C-alpha cells in the first residue's frame, strides 16, 4: 500500500485576514483507505478541516475513528490516499490512551517541562496556562490525577507547542458529564481566542453538539456529514446511530 503525506506552508491567520483564511482548509484527506490484514477498516474517506473550525468525527466504537486519526498524524503509514496539511504546521495530538509511568514520582510541573521539546518550556507553559487551568495541579503527582485532570495536563502540553491544529482522539471518554461539558467549552474557547483548528473523535453525540461546527459520521466509511442539526435529521445517521438521537 502507498501513502502520501504532504505539507504546504500558508500565512498564519492575522486580524482582518481571518475571515478569508478561515474558508481555506488546514487539513485535507483524500480517498483514505486502510486495511488491517484482510479487513478494510477505513474505506475511501475524504474530508477537510478549515482554519478556525471544530470538526468532530462521530462514530461507534470499532468504527475506525482511532485508525483514521493515526493515519492523519503519521503513525500509521500503510494506507492508500493523500493527507495534506497547510499553514505553519504546528500540530498538537492528544491520543485516546497515553502511557504515563505512574510508578515514577513525578509532579505535573516536571512532566510538562521535561517531556516538552521546545527551547522555551517555562515561557510556553506560562502561555498555555492562560487558557488551561493547570496551575493548581503543578505540584501534584501525575499518578494522583483523575482522568479529567490528566486530559487537561495533556492539552496544556499540546498548547505549549503553539499548534495551528489540535487533533483529539476521544478526549473525554473517561470523564463524567460535567467534566465533558467543561472540556468542550474549553476547546471552543481555544478556537475563539487562540485561532486554532480542532479535529476530534467521539462516540457521544450529545456532548459534541454544543461546540462542533461540523460533524462527520464515520463507520469505516463516511455515512453523512454536516452541521450537528443537519446530521441528526439524516436518514443514514439514524440507521447507523439509532441509540444516539
Curated annotation (Swiss-Prot):
Residue sites binding ATP per the record: 59-66
PROSITE patterns listed in its UniProt record: ABC_TRANSPORTER_2 (PS50893), ZNUC (PS51298)
Reaction(s) this enzyme catalyzes, per UniProt: Zn(2+)(out) + ATP(in) + H2O(in) = Zn(2+)(in) + ADP(in) + phosphate(in) + H(+)(in)
Start and end residues of each ABC transporter domain: 27-244
UniProt key word NADP: no
EC number: 7.2.2.20
GO molecular function terms listed in the Swiss-Prot or TrEMBL record: ABC-type zinc transporter activity; ATP binding; ATP hydrolysis activity
InterPro entries, per database record: AAA+_ATPase, ABC_transporter-like_ATP-bd, Metal_Ion_Import_ABC, P-loop_NTPase
GO CC, any one term: plasma membrane
Keyword Zinc annotated: yes
Membrane topology: Peripheral membrane protein
Annotated localization: Cell inner membrane
Domain of life: Bacteria
Assigned keywords, A-Z: ATP-binding, Cell inner membrane, Cell membrane, Ion transport, Membrane, Nucleotide-binding, Translocase, Transport, Zinc, Zinc transport
Subunit: The complex is composed of two ATP-binding proteins (ZnuC), two transmembrane proteins (ZnuB) and a solute-binding protein (ZnuA).
Family, as annotated: Belongs to the ABC transporter superfamily. Zinc importer (TC 3.A.1.15.5) family.
Function: Part of the ABC transporter complex ZnuABC involved in zinc import. Responsible for energy coupling to the transport system.
PANTHER family: METAL TRANSPORT SYSTEM ATP-BINDING PROTEIN TM_0124-RELATED
Protein name: Zinc import ATP-binding protein ZnuC
Organism from which the protein derives: Anaplasma marginale (strain St. Maries)
Gene: znuC
Amino acid at each position: 500500500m502507498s501513502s502520501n503525506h504532504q505539507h504546504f506552508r500558508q500565512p498564519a491567520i492575522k486580524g482582518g485576514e481571518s475571515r478569508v483564511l478561515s474558508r481555506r482548509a488546514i487539513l485535507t484527506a483524500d480517498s483514505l483507505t486502510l486495511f488491517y490484514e484482510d479487513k478494510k477498516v477505513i474505506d475511501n474517506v475524504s474530508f477537510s478541516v478549515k482554519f478556525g473550525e471544530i470538526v468532530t468525527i462521530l462514530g461507534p466504537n470499532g468504527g475506525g475513528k482511532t485508525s483514521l486519526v493515526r493515519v492523519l498524524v503519521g503513525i500509521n503509514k500503510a494506507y492508500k490516499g493523500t493527507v495534506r496539511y497547510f499553514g505553519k504546521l504546528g500540530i498538537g495530538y492528544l491520543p485516546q490512551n497515553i502511557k504515563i509511568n505512574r510508578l515514577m514520582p513525578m509532579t505535573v510541573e516536571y512532566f510538562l517541562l521535561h517531556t516538552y521539546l521546545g527551547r522555551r518550556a517555562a515561557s510556553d507553559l506560562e502561555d498555555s496556562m492562560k487558557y488551561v487551568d493547570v496551575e493548581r495541579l503543578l505540584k501534584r503527582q501525575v499518578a494522583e490525577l483523575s482522568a479529567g485532570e490528566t486530559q487537561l495536563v495533556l492539552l496544556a502540553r499540546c498548547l505549549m507547542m503553539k499548534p495551528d491544529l489540535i487533533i483529539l482522539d476521544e478526549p473525554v471518554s473517561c470523564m463524567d458529564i460535567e467534566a465533558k461539558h467543561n472540556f468542550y467549552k474549553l476547546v471552543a474557547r481555544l478556537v475563539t481566542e487562540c485561532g486554532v483548528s480542532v479535529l476530534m473523535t467521539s462516540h457521544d453525540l450529545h456532548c459534541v453538539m454544543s461546540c462542533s461546527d461540523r460533524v462527520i459520521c464515520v463507520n469505516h466509511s463516511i455515512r453523512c456529514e454536516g452541521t450537528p442539526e443537519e446530521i441528526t435529521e439524516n436518514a443514514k445517521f439514524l440507521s447507523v446511530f439509532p441509540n444516539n438521537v
